[in-house]
Regions:
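Conserved nucleotide-sugar phosphate-binding/catalytic loop shared by glycosyltransferases and other
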Residues: 7-8, 14, 32-88, 92
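Active-site-proximal region of nucleotide-activated glycan assembly enzymes
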Residues: 123-185
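Histidine-anchored nucleotide/phosphate-binding helix
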Residues: 23-34, 123-129
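Conserved nucleotide-sugar donor-binding subdomain of glycosyltransferases
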Residues: 78-119
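A short, glycine/small-residue-rich beta-strand->loop->alpha-helix junction that serves as a flexible
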Residues: 14-27, 51
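Conserved acidic residues
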Residues: 8, 105-107, 168
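Hydrophobic/aromatic beta-strand patches that form the interior of the parallel beta-sheet core
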Residues: 43-45, 61-63, 110, 137, ...
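An aromatic- and histidine-rich active-site surface loop
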Residues: 50-52, 109-128
Length: 185
């Protein structure tokens, strides 16, 4: 079906670490998109065990990837529920994210907080969609970590090349006069 005769599609990757802020923010964005344009379909990718508890407007659905949890004592990740190693869980998550992007064929892909996802899991989907010409957006909250700490983390994770080579836009959620989270990067 030609892109012009099908509904507009937005894929959102919701970082699913501890807390509900990421899923709540993605839900708010999804609800605003379908409210603004009833021809839009939004699909949210998340590993949050709480995503199914949220109420979504018509035109929104979600794919829950296998969950992971960060161990408080070690800072390492582990599979949340499955009795498989975290590497196996991450491989499943990466494939589900990429395959969902491939099949859903979004007109826009929004990634929340983590530019490459947890352990780079969004990278294959980003490259696939970039090759197709899909606009790629990184969404960041207005208040983030200390700039020096964030710069070190992004250097270690090789984020700056991904921002330059993959993303078309970076959206900052919040009031620009309050905070500029990319200062110092």
């Amino acid at each position: 079906m030609p892109a012009s005769s099908r509904s507009k599609r937005v894929l959102i990757y919701s970082h699913d670490s501890f807390g509900l802020g990421h899923v709540s923010r993605c839900r708010t964005i999804a609800n605003a998109l379908v409210e603004a344009d009833q021809s839009v379909s939004v699909l949210i990718l998340s590993g949050s065990p709480m995503i199914g508890s949220y109420e979504f407007r018509s035109g929104i659905d979600f794919v829950r990837v296998p969950g992971v949890v960060k161990q408080i004592d070690t800072g390492e990740y582990d599979s949340a529920n499955l009795r498989v190693g975290v590497e196996h869980t991450m491989e499943m998550r990466t494939r589900i994210i990429r395959d969902t992007a491939d099949i859903f064929r979004p007109d826009l892909f929004i990634v929340d907080k983590e530019p490459l996802g947890l352990r780079g899991e969004v990278g294959p989907a980003l490259r696939l969609l970039k090759d197709r010409g899909t606009p790629l957006v990184l969404g960041l909250r207005d208040v983030m970590d200390d700039p020096a700490a964030l710069a070190q983390e992004w250097e270690r994770k090789k984020i700056v090349p991904a921002l330059r080579d993959l993303y078309d836009e970076i959206w900052i959620y919040g009031l620009p006069q309050i905070n500029k989270p990319l200062t110092g990067i």
